[in-house]
Amino acid sequence: MLKDKYIDYLTFEKRYSTHTILAYRADLDEYSGFLQSQYNIIDLLQSDHTLIRSWLISLLELKNSTRSVNRKISTLKSFYRFCEKMGLLETNPMIKVVAPQISKQLPVFLTHNNIDTLFQSVDFGSGLKGSRDKLILTLFYATGIRREELVNIKTNDIDLTTGTIKVLGKRNKERIIPIGPKVIAEINNYLLIRSNSTIIVEDANLNNNTTLFVTTRGLPVNPKLVYSIVHKYLALISSSSKLSPHVLRHTFATHMLDDGADINAIKELLGHSSLAATQVYTHNTIEKLKTIYKQAHPRA
């Protein structure tokens, strides 16, 4: 089946993450369903730009966000490029498809006061869950890693001697991120509590190569649990409507930039392939400068 061959291509050649592959598969299944229900077309190769446009219009009419629609366009572009590569298409139907423009929104981030309150005033508790949750939040803010990257960290990815963490990013790109003494102390505290937690022995696979973050049953945490943990604690210190792990990634980058870090260094730490992706954080800094200017300049 063509879709299966495409998924294999993403998995073994492009080496996309499981999360990305599931999203691409879901997009293709959704488009296939649309073609069948609306036009009685089963073969994706029989599609053309007019059918694709009609699907995109229907998505927007169903109140899908522009960002969501653009991701689905990316899926179809990737799929039909694959079909071209396989010699299955004479003309790529995506050539005449234009993605809707996304209104640029500045990244949401927490203030220094928010962060101080989170780590100095919030009571995480002294047990396994509390130490784990605090370390999860600490790592997000201290390293700027993505949620998928965090859940996949193994204990042997951490080198406490050199103060570094090895992270496997998008498309399996590996990078090394430095960590400071405070983070190392939190890691040591969590590992000590985890090793002394008798409930951990429920999972016979737990050893030196295991996933760093586990549940109280000794199972690896999943992205959904990590999201709920972060949202729970950020809701205690911020009234923002956006309280996801990515907010802590934005906060890491913004605070680094505000405190004088080189933007190229931030790019490497975040695992961005392009500097353009990192430069969005400079807009927050510019807005901050504008505020200071208006407050301080006599003719502002």
Set out the residue ranges of the language-model regions:
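Conserved catalytic core of the tyrosine transesterase superfamily
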Residues: 1-300
